[in-house]
């Protein structure tokens, strides 16, 4: 009988131990700060084909977004509703440099136009999604 209780206690400890507090997919995300753009449209970005590493940064209290699309700097307005995990971008502007590799730049800027929401993708990642829930951009903490 004592053996049964010991086994039950071990099983319970293992079960409770698996309920860790690490971030899981779908949890609330604080967008504030700078992020690396690691995927666009579900495809990994090859940074050898960009002049600079693509990034996005957010200051949600100021409704501000900034970063780099791979060549040009990005600035604009980002309206974030953290409770609903929705986001909209307005007045996105870029510098006007011409770089050898511009393919990701165009894809990133087009993706920003269709972003409506965001969600945790686990492991320090966040996905910016369109109205259908498709990941348009995947961001990784810096």
Model-predicted regions and their roles:
Residues 19-142:
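Lipid interaction determinants
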Residues 1-30:
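Bacterial Sec-dependent N-terminal signal peptides
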